[in-house]
């Protein structure tokens, strides 16, 4: 039986849309380098952890770009599915992707069944755990997922890993979006205000914790986290290698003194086999040789371990550039 991952954060996150400005500042111009090369990282919404991850990686790459000639930029996108498709099209070099979305893309399953296998998808390293988190209006008195029947529920924006995972959970329950009276498609930076304004009763969100997009509604209107458990969840976790049970700590968010049980994936950093070995090697080196700095750039990264990042949650083969660095450092 798989173990339950514990998220080990002991403090709350006071962060909002200002995160975008913070990471823009981190990407300030540096001296031009000869034979400069550009790499782009697909992330997610500007208030989410994926954007923070991309910003942290680019910050460390750009720090030494006068030496290696690579300039890194972050793209705010619709999320995991969009990132995979755009990497496949050659329009992005790298991206942050849920491990389940990466698995389906590489194997041509799930939402990628019609498109077929993306056999050039390559893993770079994994990041933080992402529990699927159900957040509801306090007044709605929702105690379990079953209580959401007939409610107004945000299922995630199209192209996001959250949306793909929501649809998989519903299918496993023998349900579809008609289970809700309204299935809204708001972005993560919109769902908190919609909840507090009474426009929706809850939302589903796969995210690293603590998250500003959950901190805001739990602070502003006492929003409640709801555990996501039961036989269907147990079967999903046992069936799919990219899932694990996850516990969100008691008191991580205001007005939520209880531990919240759920399941989830890992965020992973991916690329294409078409991206040069030297480029990926340089990006990996920038992160792993400034690892303590990287961990400080967002609370979700605080308990990352190098040894876990080279093996856990990787849904596609390692890119040769990443593999070369990891072998040099004895991590493989």
Predicted regions span which residues?
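Pocket-lining segment of extracytoplasmic ligand-binding domains
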Residues: 99-101, 110-111, 140, 176-270, ...
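An extracytoplasmic/periplasmic, membrane-proximal ligand-sensing/linker region
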Residues: 190, 197, 207-225, 235-238, ...
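Ligand-binding clefts/hinges and TM-proximal coupling segments of bilobed small-molecule sensing domains
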Residues: 151-168, 242-304, 308-311
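N-terminal (or domain-start) structured segment
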Residues: 35-104
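A structural signal for short loop-to-beta-strand junctions that line the ligand-binding cleft
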Residues: 113-127, 132, 252-261
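Bilobed "Venus flytrap"/periplasmic-binding protein-like clamshell domains
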Residues: 38-64, 70, 126, 130-197, ...
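Sec/Tat signal peptide C-region and signal peptidase I cleavage site
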Residues: 28-34
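Bacterial N-terminal signal peptides that target proteins for export
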Residues: 2-20, 28
């Amino acid at each position: 039986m798989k173990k339950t991952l514990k998220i080990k954060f002991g403090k709350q996150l006071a962060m909002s849309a200002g995160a975008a400005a913070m990471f823009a500042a981190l990407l300030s111009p540096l001296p031009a380098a000869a034979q400069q090369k550009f790499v782009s990282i697909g992330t997610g919404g500007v208030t989410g952890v994926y954007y923070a991850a991309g910003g942290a990686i680019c910050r460390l790459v750009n720090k030494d770009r006068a030496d290696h000639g690579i300039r890194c930029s972050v793209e705010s996108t619709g999320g995991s599915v969009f990132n995979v498709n755009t990497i496949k099209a050659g329009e992005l070099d790298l991206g942050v992707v849920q491990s389940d979305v990466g698995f389906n893309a590489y194997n041509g399953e799930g939402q990628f069944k019609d498109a077929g296998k993306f056999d050039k998808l390559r893993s770079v390293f994994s990041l933080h755990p992402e529990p699927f988190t159900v957040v509801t209006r306090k007044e709605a008195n929702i105690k379990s997922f079953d209580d959401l029947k007939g409610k107004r529920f945000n299922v995630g924006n199209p192209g996001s890993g959250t949306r793909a995972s929501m649809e998989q959970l519903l299918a496993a329950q023998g349900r579809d979006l008609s289970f809700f009276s309204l299935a809204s498609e708001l972005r993560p930076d919109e769902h908190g205000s919609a909840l507090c304004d009474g426009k929706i009763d809850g939302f589903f969100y796969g995210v690293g914790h603590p998250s500003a997009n959950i901190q805001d509604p739990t602070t502003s209107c006492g929003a409640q986290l709801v555990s996501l458990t039961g036989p269907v969840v147990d079967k999903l976790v046992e069936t799919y290698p990219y899932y694990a049970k996850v516990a969100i700590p008691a008191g991580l968010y205001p007005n939520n003194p209880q531990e919240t049980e759920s399941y989830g994936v890992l965020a992973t950093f991916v690329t294409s086999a078409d991206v040069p070995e030297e480029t990926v090697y340089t990006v990996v080196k920038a992160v792993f040789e400034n690892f303590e700095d990287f961990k400080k750039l967002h609370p979700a990264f605080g308990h990352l371990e190098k040894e876990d990042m080279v093996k856990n949650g990787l849904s596609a083969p390692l890119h040769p550039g990443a593999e070369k660095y990891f072998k040099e450092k004895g991590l493989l």
